């Protein structure tokens, strides 16, 4: 097992390119690069990150979900095309700085009356998204997130049945916030976990790590 630190841990303290230098200087061996804005999806910026990463292993890339990920599942052809254009640009960048995995949230589920997910339809969507990522040597990995698509155990396994290339990211904090036992998510993802997001809280519930 290799432990690492996400550039997101330095959000608003260091820009991504500088975060890599800081993490490397601290002796961190592996990282997830969290690209936070559309201008960071460019190949020029990716080359800057590649130059700054030093000996860091870039395990994965994480993108800001609300910028385009929900539209990858949309029915409007123009919006969906634009979303896939952004996806491919981001994956081309990931290929340049060496990320092999894409931590993915997908659809947001912010409304309490959200329609229950259709696993069969979602599997077709995920197959299309996964194929686009694979063009750049990147594996699509669905993360459990309490306010996004995968917010309860059972959904990953149902989607994976129709999209066998899909992998999973287990997030400890998000499992806690979903109010489901974390063991249920681990069981749901069994055999498919790509990487794990760890965090810790103090006695007041404040994130420490």
Language model regions located:
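N-terminal pre-domain/capping segments
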Residues: 1-95, 134, 167
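Acidic-and-aromatic substrate-binding clefts and catalytic sites of carbohydrate-active enzymes
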Residues: 8-16, 34-45, 71, 110-114, ...
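Active-site acidic/histidine proton-transfer and metal-coordination neighborhood
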Residues: 17, 72-167
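Acidic/histidine-rich catalytic cores of soluble enzymes
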Residues: 30-31, 61, 127-209
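Short secondary-structure boundary segments
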Residues: 35, 106, 200
């Amino acid at each position: 097992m290799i432990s690492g630190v996400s550039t997101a841990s330095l959000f608003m303290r260091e820009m991504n390119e500088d975060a890599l230098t800081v993490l490397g200087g601290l002796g961190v061996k592996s990282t997830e690069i969290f690209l936070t804005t559309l201008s960071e999806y460019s190949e020029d910026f990716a080359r800057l990150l590649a130059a700054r990463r030093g000996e860091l292993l870039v395990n994965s890339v994480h993108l800001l979900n609300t910028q385009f990920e929900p539209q990858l599942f949309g029915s409007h052809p123009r919006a969906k095309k634009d979303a896939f254009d952004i996806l491919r640009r981001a994956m081309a960048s990931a290929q340049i700085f060496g990320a092999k995995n894409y931590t993915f949230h997908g659809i947001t589920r912010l409304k309490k009356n959200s329609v229950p997910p259709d696993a069969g339809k979602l599997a077709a969507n995920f197959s299309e998204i996964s194929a686009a990522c694979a063009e750049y040597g990147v594996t699509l990995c669905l993360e459990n997130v309490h306010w996004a698509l995968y917010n309860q155990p059972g959904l990953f396994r149902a989607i994976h049945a129709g999209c066998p290339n899909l992998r999973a990211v287990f997030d400890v904090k998000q499992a806690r916030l979903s109010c489901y036992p974390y063991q249920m998510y681990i069981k749901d993802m069994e055999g498919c976990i790509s990487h794990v997001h760890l965090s810790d809280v103090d006695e007041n519930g404040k994130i420490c790590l």
